[in-house]
Design a protein with these regions (language model features):
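Short, intrinsically disordered, mixed-charge
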Residues: 21-25, 71, 119
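Compact, glycine-rich, soluble single-domain proteins
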Residues: 29-31, 35-81
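Beta-strand/loop substructures that line and gate deep hydrophobic ligand-binding cavities in soluble
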Residues: 79-103
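Terminal, regulation- and interaction-focused segments at domain boundaries
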Residues: 1-26, 126, 131
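Well-ordered alpha/beta subsegment
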Residues: 97, 101-131
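Residues at alpha-helix termini
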Residues: 25, 42-43, 123
Length: 131
């Protein structure tokens, strides 16, 4: 799956705070946070490495997408995944909106959303935000 990816030079919990701030600077709010490792431990008693999913939404982009096609709700919110990076720090990835919305009527919107997600992850990759 085509993704926008970066590494944040911080442990996962600290990286999550930096990613949240970087998303906010780029117009995204975090609507949900799922601790996948904790959920799987609680429900299935299995251990796995840390994995968090932030459900991020840019209201303007969401509104535009829904105006173009109500089924765009199936793609909301945008998942931003955080997991320990093999070489240290935290790997952060999001599905590239251009891959999710290949239809011509979504091209401009998908490009704008990808640019904002890329900017957010680029900011987060420095381990700090502009705030």
């Amino acid at each position: 799956m085509r993704a926008i990816e970066t590494t944040v030079p911080l442990p996962l919990d600290e990286a999550a705070a930096v990613v949240r701030a970087a998303l906010a600077e780029n117009g995204f709010g975090v609507l949900t946070e799922i601790d996948v490792a904790a959920t799987l431990k609680a429900k299935l008693d299995v251990d796995r490495p840390a994995l968090k999913i932030l459900g991020a939404c840019n209201p303007g982009f969401a509104h535009q997408a829904l105006q173009l096609d109500p089924n765009a709700a199936l793609l909301l919110p945008c998942n931003v995944v955080l997991e320990p990076a093999p070489d240290g720090g935290t790997r952060v990835s999001a599905v590239d909106p251009r891959a999710l919305m290949p239809e011509p009527e979504f091209a401009e919107l998908a490009e704008s959303a990808a640019a904002k997600l890329t900017a957010a992850l680029d900011t987060a990759s420095h381990g700090t935000t502009g705030s």
